[in-house]
């Protein structure tokens, strides 16, 4: 056996030589193990990308919060099923945590602080424009204070137009058509009803409800000045248990139709009360196609209740049908039948932006999210960089009994679905913005 020597040292004997060789091997193995563990640790430290949904999960609109949660859970599951999000550090999974705001501003802010402390980089909310406004303000201030812990706000339902106009915020992205866009689509259908001569306006008394009634009056004046507004009323949000007095006033006014942006139980109880008092006019709604409203109206709503959305299950097309059936396979209970294509497009847009940025760092992602263009279920939408307002097609549907080619799917097992009345391309409902975006310096 050849001897191992050290410069300036005496030759080693056989035993010393064996010990030295074993020591060298041990050190090398330890080094390789350390390097491997360090690499794995670095990857582990990246971990999953943290998402936080801040929503009213209790209180009068708890069912709406739970319905949104199912949509986001499904979106996250689909992304993770394909391996997660590709970044410069490899594939990373998404993790969604929910926080109960109880629909209150202070609770929403408390939830935001908890989410940030838990490592959330992306905040999702939508079931209150009032909550959205305070979250936008808080997130902007937080991002200025702590640029190393920035977060982005992705809004799926808060549609007060101001949020992407005079109150626009670089850190906020809205994926639902705002109230004026939705009203534009509804009014294009309403104006064709030449028999309609009087309407009653009713809404929830907060920023969104006020915006809906304000825009309804403006568009009626422009498109159908012959229509009389026989009532214009706001009611407390989420606090009215009995809508019979409101329904009685609507019927007594002689109105032939109601225009409302009401959602959740405030809509379900309203249409139920209207049925009880015998009101036989139409309902032009933003959200009358879900969460109990069709079942509450029953046959009385057939041909009478209209709704506007970015997509409905009975929109024609193989891709649309495939999308809806995939959701129904995941959530097969009638009570769980509440799917919004925009929420899936929102998650796909976020994934696209993270992958293009190469990391989950919110500023880098925001710069890519401004350019997002995604498609699913036969629907395509893109983000407008000027104001962070997503541009997508809209559809108006009218309540009908399930059956035939036009209404193959019902809503929540009610036996009633929505037949497509008119579809609008994205550019047909796009509206100018007054947003003066203040962009971060770096």
Label each residue range with its predicted role:
Residues 48, 63-70, 82-163, 175, ...:
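Beta-alpha junction/loop-to-helix N-cap segments that form part of ligand/metal-binding clefts
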Residues 373-442:
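Solvent-exposed, acidic/polar segments of extracytosolic/periplasmic ligand-binding ectodomains
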Residues 107-110, 161-162, 169-278, 314-322:
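Extracellular/periplasmic Venus flytrap/periplasmic-binding protein
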Residues 115-129, 146-156, 198-203, 254-264, ...:
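Periplasmic-binding protein-like
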Residues 64-84, 182, 207-226, 349:
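Short, solvent-exposed amphipathic alpha-helices that sit
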Residues 169, 271-345, 355-360, 412-441:
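Extracellular/periplasmic periplasmic-binding protein-like sensory domains
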Residues 52-75, 99-105, 128, 202-211, ...:
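Extracytoplasmic "Venus flytrap"
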Residues 1-50, 113, 117, 438-442:
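Short, low-complexity disordered leader/linker segments with a strong preference
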